[in-house]
Amino acid sequence: MQIKNFPFLFLLNSLIIFSCSTIASLPEEPSSPQESTLKALSLYEAHLSSYIMYLQTFLVKTKQKVNNKNYPEFTLFDTSKLKKDQTLKSIKTNIAALKNHIDKIKPIAMQIYKKYSKNIP
């Protein structure tokens, strides 16, 4: 059996292999809303939650991939600390808790990204 598109398939396989050997990039932290309405703050809270989940997933997956015993310690966000009701006060409390956790893990994620983004085998 002869493969007619061998160069193309070789190039495609090489591209897939090399593209999978890098770690994900880090997105920008969501910016604060212009207005302090319930809707705007709720959306901001959701964006911060997504951002934390991304950072945590990045850290966990990178830790597994690099398998380095000197990998920095980090804690996962405890969602049980979030208020369940949708009042302005509760949402502002949740935003403060989310931003506090981001302030703790973002520097670790940035450090890991800078260290390993080009050095993944």
From Swiss-Prot:
A GO cellular component entry from the record: cell outer membrane
Residues carrying the lipid (N-palmitoyl cysteine) are 20
Which N-terminal residues, if any, form the signal peptide?
1-19
Q: Indicate whether Signal appears among the record's keywords.
A: yes
Task: List keywords of the entry alphabetically.
Answer: Cell outer membrane, Lipoprotein, Membrane, Palmitate, Plasmid, Signal
Sorted alphabetically, which InterPro entries does this protein's record hold?
Borrelia_plasmid_OrfD (IPR004248)
List the S-diacylglycerol cysteine lipid attachment residues. Answer: 20
Please indicate which superkingdom the organism of origin belongs to. Answer: Bacteria
Topology of this chain in the membrane: Lipid-anchor
Cited function: Outer membrane lipoprotein that could act as a component of a potential toxin-antitoxin system in B.burgdorferi which could serve as a plasmid stabilization mechanism in a growing bacterial population.
Additional free-text comment from the UniProt record: Is a highly immunogenic protein recognized by sera from Lyme disease patients.
Q: What is this protein called?
A: Outer membrane lipoprotein BBA14
